[in-house]
């Protein structure tokens, strides 16, 4: 029963958004005509119109928000206008597949539902929890607004795609969706993308060990916790036999570089920014321990972290804070410090540096998980089942 699917994304370009790209190619392989509307990237994904491997991608210019919550009103308003404009140009579709944040695409979904389309809500983030975690404003007017937008999105959705069981529970309890209307499509690394390459010892800057952080650097991502933990690794554990690489970019990149200098870590850490895949593989293949420092907050506790999945795909042992979904994802492939306890986080890093056999065992367990129960093959089946349910 394949037809024409329109996927809407606002916060990343495609195919840089790996989850959306996996979903797009899975649908293409199942016979769907797939269109994606997303923002243009700044250094990659810059073409306005492009077809890649049979997926038609329509991009629009977007300036990222600055200046706190009100800055997002301008960003999201612009994104909504461009998305609506491009959707009109694409014409009738059978399924509108909206990825959040923000929880605004239901406005387009409602219009297209009146023309016969089904609406799938792919909930990448719990936006109310994201708001509380990112902005220290409490349950103010804007918080109540994002709650209303989430409820409207749930009401509009024929089917909800959740990234894990915690999100599924929210869709049923807070969103009022029936169990057969919610499908768990876990984010999973593309196994063919993550493979070991020979370690590059020069990345260790002459030290015996290398630590690595991979991912976005936003206010809720915990890079500041990682840096303070590394300062404690040096000061409390007396360890200076390591070098650390922080791979990725984001809103707090400059602030984190400044914090590393304040902590006296300038000679211990490198910040690479976003790098090509071949360089990413060199860093992960060289790393002895990988860091997942996301602090406990309302969002992180129930979210699946892509970096954890990617560390496991590369067979790297992980140090994480003790978060609900982190333990579901990594299992015994990680050691867990009490939430937000930087001293314990540092102790666990030191423990793994001194135990190469445990590092090897944990890495093998992680690889087995992403090749088995957490593989994209299982997610592929759930995605296609969600589409079948949306178009009975």
Predicted regions and their residues:
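Conserved donor-binding/catalytic core segment of Leloir-type glycosyltransferases
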Residues: 161, 204-230, 245
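A short, well-ordered alpha-helix in the C-terminal region of glycosyltransferases
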Residues: 351, 358-373, 382-385
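Nucleotide-activated donor-binding/catalytic signature segment of Leloir-type glycosyltransferases, i.e.
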Residues: 247, 254-281
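Membrane-proximal helix-turn-helix segments that form the acceptor-binding/catalytic region
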Residues: 25, 84-85, 107, 111-115, ...
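Carbohydrate-associated surface elements
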Residues: 166, 187-188
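N-terminal subdomain of nucleotide-sugar transferases
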Residues: 1-56, 159
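Conserved acidic donor-binding segment of nucleotide-sugar-dependent glycosyltransferases
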Residues: 334-343, 351-357
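Nucleotide-sugar-dependent
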Residues: 221, 278-283, 292-313, 319-328
